[in-house]
Amino acid sequence: MQNKIQVKSVKERENALIFCAENTEIEVKELTARNHVLVDSDHLSFLYILENESSFVYVSIPHTCWEAMREAMQQDKKMFVHVNDMEIELEQLKEELEYLIRNIEGNANYGEELVSAVEKVFL
């Protein structure tokens, strides 16, 4: 997947969680939130979709960031990705994740490893 922004760590700010990503050659100031999340079972990640006029870009949030994300969800914090010195709000991330988590619970179609990781952190 060439259009991917890889989250490496998180930091907290008052009423917000920031996903800190590797810098990229992707023109991030053109990107807007798509309000949709996919699952990458192979890499134990959630993929938040951003878009510009011509393509989609996936923000890969690995399982190493899920604990902080769960806490942010419980506290109704906004969540952003910080990449190339810019922040983009990941709109509707909480709602999308809540929906996905309900579908992943006990569902072998997502792969045993992903189901186990999601259940351990979120359920």
UniProtKB/Swiss-Prot annotation:
It comes from the Bacteria. Pfam families: UPF0738. Belongs to the UPF0738 family. This is UPF0738 protein Bcer98_0913. It comes from Bacillus cytotoxicus (strain DSM 22905 / CIP 110041 / 391-98 / NVH 391-98). The lineage of its organism: Bacteria, Bacillati, Bacillota, Bacilli, Bacillales.
